[in-house]
Amino acid sequence: MAETENVREIRDENYQSLIPMDEYLAAGVHIGTQQKTEDMKKFIYRVRSDGLYVLDVQSTDERIRAAAKFLSRYDPANVLVVCARQYGQHPAEMFARAIGARHIVGRFIPGTLTNPVYMFFAEPDVVVVTDPIGDAQAVTEAISIGVPVVAMCDTNNMTSNIDLVIPTNNKGRKALALVYWLLAREVSRERNEQGFSYTVNDFESEI
């Protein structure tokens, strides 16, 4: 309970989040790593006694809203979702399915965005990645062709090549499921689409 109270005191007790703050905390969205970068410093609320950095979940909530507005402006067929990280692959695939986007999970083949002769060559208008470290090849190629990148970033990530950061635990199974589900729901709402029936459980990877 103390953790919940601490996070709620971050900036605005009257802030109306997309879901109850307790749900972010229960999924571990706020749990960072024992490393921090200067880039992510502004999204960090505090450091625990064990050296673990804690993310500001209000920033997470705000950035999910911003990312949903941003992504909703694109033709979903031209949105590419990428994830190499194990626990992010199913949520990323479900997110793509929910909004009508393309997805590449597992290994990202070099040249996917830059080599027109490659069988699975893709020309997206925007790329969503789960971790700028694990998905570094996709980020590099997106930058080289001038395509914006939306990324889920933990406390240890560099963000200089990211256009829109969603600060979150990008390693946890439940955290990734919640953030991808919520982002899908908000994109659907921004598009004024009806019938979004997915649940968080639909997005959660099996252990």
Curated annotation (Swiss-Prot):
GO terms for biological process: translation. GO terms for cellular component: small ribosomal subunit. InterPro entries: Ribosomal_uS2, Ribosomal_uS2_arc, Ribosomal_uS2_CS, Ribosomal_uS2_euk/arc, Ribosomal_uS2_flav_dom_sf. It comes from the Archaea. The keyword Ribonucleoprotein applies. Keywords: Ribonucleoprotein, Ribosomal protein. The keyword Ribosomal protein applies. GO terms for molecular function: structural constituent of ribosome. Belongs to the universal ribosomal protein uS2 family. PANTHER family: 40S RIBOSOMAL PROTEIN SA (PTHR11489). This is Small ribosomal subunit protein uS2. It comes from Methanocella arvoryzae (strain DSM 22066 / NBRC 105507 / MRE50). The lineage of its organism: Archaea, Methanobacteriati, Methanobacteriota, Stenosarchaea group, Methanomicrobia.
